[in-house]
């Protein structure tokens, strides 16, 4: 589905005394692809019977939609407008009509895939216009719902899981290009706006059947959208207004979210088949990339300001839960797993600009990862069961939540300010709630850890020259948060203290690298700043029967803030301050609490808090040309702090015949260094 002028192989010249518009609209009605098991009356249904034990509903939407002006010379006395407005939607579900009986139902496998591409492109040789507007406003949604199609059956067989997979893996592009320059008498707006989501649900059966084999639910929601926004020019490009570039993955309603939730089965004395876990997994792994590139001998003159912002706001939510109406059920294990691994980047390469206003580039990542599991177990549970709620920001140490901003080469001159900022913030929260169990039979493990990995950086290298009549500000910030609360009142019965604990782990790396010339007539400020909020809480109170081992709460924070001013750099300010500061821990709030109260049914007296805090803050200045403030001070500082750190252990177990044994363990390593050599 394409609306276009020109192609890769042709280069038409287009002239207009008015406006030039290329607009592509795709699936604005939002119908998409739909598949329903058990409906039997839809032309968009793809239903397969896999053997005799599984039914499959598969909904896929893979489309390419584009609005484009490619190559050639564009001359318009009015405006040039290129817009892509479209929706990629895939929905697959189990029909839950009341006409289906209680027999001959199978395990339901439901998959919804929303993929394909949406593009808004203006790539001309030269362009003359009043204003230019390039906009890609797109939607990509996948929804999968599984469960019982109105009935249950004894002897389902080896297949044992109702499955729902919702995957959104769309790609989106928005581009402005003027290979040989041009003249714009107004402003340029370039926008790439993503409304993306993935939702997978496991429905709860509403019938009550005795003595039957039923399946558990396995639910996955994956949000893997990729978004690229580019502004490219060569030659001489004159702009009489502003340039605004905006690349955003939006968090509005269900958009910006991977949502996976299980229901469960209902009825008395139901036994599981094969698999024994209800599992919900939600993951975001979006990529949002914005590039500004000057090609060859290039020069941009701008009477207004230049603003480039890439921003992603995402959420991953996984919930393994039970319907409140569930009776004395054997439900097996409950597992929820949420993670975010988003990448946001802004790159400015080889751009030569003369700006009458302000140059501002921002890269922003804001994410939340929440995992919630209801307690497993119950009468008649066979074998070991577990409740696990695992929340992650980042997927692993080598796959962190990443936000970066890079300027390489080129020259940027601004009559006002130059602002470069990378901001990385996230929250990981793990929750375990009371389930429906009435005893501790078969419950062996309840855990709710959080793990987070962050990477944040600002880099100005390659001999870039930044000159401002106002101030120059380079800032790399991370704000991290983690919460795990294991309180007996919230969790319920039968809690094994060796496994059940409030537990958080955060690793953060924050860097600023300068290999360039920075000249500010006012102030020059370079900052790397890291702040953490952590709450680990384990409380044995009247709400739960704690047994075995030691009651423990754990917080671990490992982070570094590093500023490097590399060889051949020149930094100068005239009428304001010049500061280079790496700050870590100054605004932390870290609370670690382990507590036993006599009001609980608590068969232990050992209590521990375990805090590990390793913070490195460094400024490394070496082999630079000069660092100079003509009329003010030069401040170079590295600050590694432990403000806001509280640990609390207590045991009140009088009358229970248990001797209290209480310890606080804190390992705190703070390293701050300023290294200046050959300056």
What is each stretch, according to the model?
Residues 1-679:
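Low-complexity, glycine- and small/polar-enriched segments
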């Amino acid at each position: 589905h394409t609306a276009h002028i020109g192609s890769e192989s042709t280069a038409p010249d287009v002239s207009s005394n008015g406006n030039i518009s290329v607009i592509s609209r795709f699936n604005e009605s939002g119908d998409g692809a739909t598949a329903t098991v058990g409906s039997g009356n839809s032309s968009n249904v793809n239903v397969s019977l896999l053997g005799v034990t599984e039914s499959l509903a598969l909904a896929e939407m893979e489309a390419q939609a584009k609005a484009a002006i490619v190559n050639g010379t564009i001359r318009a006395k009015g405006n040039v407008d290129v817009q892509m407005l479209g929706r990629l939607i895939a929905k697959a579900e189990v029909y839950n009509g009341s006409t289906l009986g209680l027999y001959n139902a199978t395990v339901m496998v439901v998959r919804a895939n929303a993929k394909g591409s949406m593009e808004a492109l203006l790539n001309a040789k030269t362009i003359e216009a009043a204003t230019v507007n390039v906009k890609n406003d797109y939607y990509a949604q996948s929804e999968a719902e599984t469960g019982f199609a109105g009935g249950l059956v004894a002897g389902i067989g080896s297949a044992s899981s109702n499955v729902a997979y919702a995957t959104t893996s769309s790609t989106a592009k928005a581009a402005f290009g003027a290979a040989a320059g041009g003249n714009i008498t107004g402003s340029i707006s370039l926008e790439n706006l993503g409304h993306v989501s993935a939702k997978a649900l496991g429905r709860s059966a509403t019938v009550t059947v005795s003595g039957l084999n039923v399946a558990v639910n396995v639910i996955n929601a994956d949000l893997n959208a990729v978004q690229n926004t580019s502004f490219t020019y060569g030659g001489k490009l004159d702009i009489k207004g502003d340039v605004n570039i905006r690349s955003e993955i939006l968090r509005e309603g269900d958009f910006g979210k991977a949502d996976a939730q299980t229901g469960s089965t209902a009825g008395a004395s139901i036994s599981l088949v094969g698999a024994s876990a209800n599992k919900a997994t939600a993951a975001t792994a979006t990529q949002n990339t914005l590039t500004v590139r000057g090609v060859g001998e290039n020069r941009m003159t701008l009477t207004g300001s230049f603003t480039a912002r890439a921003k992603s706001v995402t959420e991953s939510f996984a919930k393994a839960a039970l319907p409140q109406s569930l009776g004395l059920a054997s439900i097996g294990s409950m597992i929820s797993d949420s993670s975010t691994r988003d990448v946001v980047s802004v790159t400015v390469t080889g751009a030569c600009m003369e700006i009458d206003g302000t140059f501002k580039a921002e890269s922003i990542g804001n994410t939340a990862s929440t995992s919630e599991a209801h307690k497993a177990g119950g009468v008649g549970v066979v074998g070991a069961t577990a409740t696990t709620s695992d929340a992650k920001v980042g997927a692993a140490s080598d796959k962190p939540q990443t936000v970066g901003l890079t300027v390489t080469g080129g020259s940027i001159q601004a009559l006002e300010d130059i602002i470069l900022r990378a901001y990385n913030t996230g929250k990981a929260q793990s929750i375990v709630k009371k389930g429906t169990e009435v005893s501790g039979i078969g419950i062996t493990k309840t855990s709710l850890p959080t793990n987070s990995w962050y990477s944040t950086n600002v880099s100005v290298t390659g001999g870039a020259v930044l000159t401002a009549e106002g101030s120059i500000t380079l800032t790399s910030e991370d704000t991290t948060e983690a919460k795990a609360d294991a309180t007996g009142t919230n969790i319920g019965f039968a809690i094994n203290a060796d496994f059940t604990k409030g537990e958080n782990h955060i690793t953060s790396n924050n860097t600023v690298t300068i290999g360039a010339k920075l000249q500010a007539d006012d102030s020059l400020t370079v900052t790397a700043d890291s702040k953490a909020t952590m709450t680990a809480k384990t409380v044995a109170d009247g709400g739960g029967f704690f047994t075995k081992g030691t009651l423990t709460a754990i917080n671990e924070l490992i982070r570094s803030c590093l500023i490097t001013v590399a060889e051949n750099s020149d930094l100068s300010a005239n009428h304001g301050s010049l500061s280079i500061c790496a700050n870590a821990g100054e605004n932390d709030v870290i609370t670690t609490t382990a507590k036993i109260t006599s009001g609980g049914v608590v068969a232990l007296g050992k209590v521990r808090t375990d805090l590990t805090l390793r913070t490195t803050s460094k400024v490394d200045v070496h082999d630079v040309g000069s660092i100079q403030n003509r009329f003010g001070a030069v401040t170079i500082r590295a600050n590694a702090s432990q403000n806001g750190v509280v640990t609390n252990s207590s045991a009140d177990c009088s009358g229970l015949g248990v001797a209290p044994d209480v310890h606080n363990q804190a390992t705190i390593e703070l390293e701050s260094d300023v290294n200046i050599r050959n300056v």
